[in-house]
């Protein structure tokens, strides 16, 4: 099942409870345990400025878009073996769609 636009408000709520402890989204936001996600769409894996990535993330070589994030967020450690992202993933496609819809807006403002 591919990405389909979701509910931005539900995505914001999911991000706040499941992602924000490790990631920021605003321009110039700090890297935390995970990298700042501003500008993530169109960026290659392992390229957020000032963040120390694993070799696996740097070498994956894919560009983040709706489809790659949809696959990654289902099971990050399966998609990029060796990633240090501890989050197990969003198993429900609707949750992934909602978070990605939120990220598309929040990481580009």
UniProtKB/Swiss-Prot annotation:
Record keywords: Electron transport, Heme, Iron, Metal-binding, Methylation, Mitochondrion, Respiratory chain, Transport
Gene3D superfamilies given in the database record: Cytochrome c-like domain
Pfam families assigned: Cytochrom_C
Binding sites annotated in the UniProt record for heme c: 19, 22-23, 85
N6,N6,N6-trimethyllysine PTM positions: 77
Modifications the protein undergoes after translation, according to the UniProt entry: Binds 1 heme c group covalently per subunit.
Record-linked InterPro entries: Cyt_c-like_dom, Cyt_c-like_dom_sf, Cyt_c_1A/1B
GO terms for MF: electron transfer activity; heme binding; metal ion binding
An example Gene Ontology biological process: mitochondrial ATP synthesis coupled electron transport
Cellular component GO terms held in the UniProt record: mitochondrial intermembrane space; respiratory chain complex
Compartments where located: Mitochondrion intermembrane space
Matching PANTHER family: CYTOCHROME C (PTHR11961)
Record family assignment: Belongs to the cytochrome c family.
Entry function: Electron carrier protein. The oxidized form of the cytochrome c heme group can accept an electron from the heme group of the cytochrome c1 subunit of cytochrome reductase. Cytochrome c then transfers this electron to the cytochrome oxidase complex, the final protein carrier in the mitochondrial electron-transport chain.
Protein's UniProt name: Cytochrome c
